[in-house]
Amino acid sequence: MQNTYFVIIGSNDRLLYEYPKESAMKYASDNEYVLNQFVILSALDFIEEKKKTTPKMYFKSIDVYGSHHLSAFVTSGNIKFVLMSTSKTDDTKGFFTAVYEDYVKIILNPFYELQTPIESEGLNTHIKQLLKQYKLE
């Protein structure tokens, strides 16, 4: 399984963005991509439960799957950022905050239609840099 997998899920639980893209990932098996998505989607239930009990936007640890830790950030518009990583760094909040700033810039673009998949090479590059900066990759 990949060391790091990051997704942005829309308020309607549709996948808006993923890093790395399926085509860029190297898998040990064909089912690995599906397993990554399954783990992330099952974590959405945990996120919804935690969101009901607390007004927090950042959830440091929502689930553990094998050696992977899942963290989440939920915007006020109910957009969910979910990170699955083997890294044990404590600064995932900084990563989510930086990605949130990028997300806000994207949705403020008049050519972007809300709740549609995000196709941005600039975002891919910046997320790759952020993952290295926060030692998550």
What are these regions (language model features)?
Residues M1-Y5, S11-E137:
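Acidic, low-complexity cytosolic segments
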